[in-house]
Amino acid sequence: MRRISLTSSPVRLLLFLLLLLIALEIMVGGHSLCFNFTIKSLSRPGQPWCEAQVFLNKNLFLQYNSDNNMVKPLGLLGKKVYATSTWGELTQTLGEVGRDLRMLLCDIKPQIKTSDPSTLQVEMFCQREAERCTGASWQFATNGEKSLLFDAMNMTWTVINHEASKIKETWKKDRGLEKYFRKLSKGDCDHWLREFLGHWEAMPEPTVSPVNASDIHWSSSSLPDRWIILGAFILLVLMGIVLICVWWQNGEWQAGLWPLRTS
């Protein structure tokens, strides 16, 4: 068998290292925008029936409530967004989405097994990697119970709680509703994410402590930090295996010269 010399294949190793760096960039370079809505079927006077929190890369920077129909900026990022033309559009959209979600809650309330006032928790999520949208989804919980997941990328529903099966069938039949969810998460959310990232990347460092978004998000398009670390570790191990194989075939392992070859 022809021996493969380490010095005769530098291009191969450089290409492998380049692919490794690209893979790591894709894994850790993702950005996300998350809108968390809490909708109440009934609210006391002076208390909002809709509240929303907006997270960029898990950092809370905007808050909204229906009582005054205003968006409150938080931290330096929130103040930067406040000074843009996007602010008015965002305020209007949050109000419209809140009203639409409240109508959905009224529609499904008879299917919720409780006589008490009901709440609907909704998370709209979008993600970008390598300059493109790689994730868009909606997650729903009724009265704190996780119920449904809608993947706007492939227009599919997942039932989390079997009691939400009827709700899922009702919404699935409404093609206009599905298109509405897709437009908001894959269209508007992704557009805002691109806009906000310009301000995020211009900041020297996050000025708002990371706050985890609602734990009702289970989209497979979002990679948890532990999986990013595990993936990077696996890639490094694979690189080590390839290098060992090259040195082994070059006969340096047996000669006791690995990894001290200088020529």
Curated annotation (Swiss-Prot):
Residue spans, topological domain Extracellular: 31-225
Broad class of where this protein is predominantly found: membrane
**Transmembrane domains' residue ranges:** 226-248
Keyword Nucleotidyltransferase carried by entry: no
Q: Which positions carry the signal peptide feature in this UniProt record?
A: 1-30
Q: What is this protein called?
A: Retinoic acid early transcript 1E
Which tissues is this protein detected in according to the database? Answer: Predominantly expressed in the skin, but also expressed in testis and trachea. Up-regulated in tumor cells of different origins. Expression progressively decreased after treatment of tumor cells with retinoic acid.
Q: MHC class I alpha-2 like: where is this region?
A: 117-207
Subcellular location field? Membrane
Keywords from the UniProt entry: Disulfide bond, Glycoprotein, Immunity, Membrane, Secreted, Signal, Transmembrane, Transmembrane helix
> How the protein assembles, per its UniProt entry?
Binds to KLRK1/NKG2D. (Microbial infection) Contrary to other family members, does not interact with CMV glycoprotein UL16.
Q: Which domain of life is it from?
A: Eukaryota
Q: Which residues lie on this side of the membrane: Cytoplasmic?
A: 249-263
MF terms from GO for this chain are:
natural killer cell lectin-like receptor binding
Q: Which family does it belong to?
A: Belongs to the MHC class I family.
UniProt cross-references to Gene3D superfamilies, sorted A to Z: MHC class I-like antigen recognition-like
Q: Name one matching Pfam family.
A: MHC_I
Q: How does it sit in the membrane?
A: Single-pass type I membrane protein
Residues linked to a glycan = 36, 154, 212
**Gene name of this polypeptide:** RAET1E
Q: Domain annotation text?
A: MHC class I alpha-1 like and MHC class I alpha- like regions down-regulate the cell surface expression of KLRK1.
InterPro entries per record: MHC_class-I_related, MHC_I-like_Ag-recog, MHC_I-like_Ag-recog_sf, MHC_I/II-like_Ag-recog
Its Gene Ontology cellular component terms are: external side of plasma membrane; extracellular space; plasma membrane
Cystine crosslinks? 126-189
**Annotated region MHC class I alpha-1 like: where?**
31-116
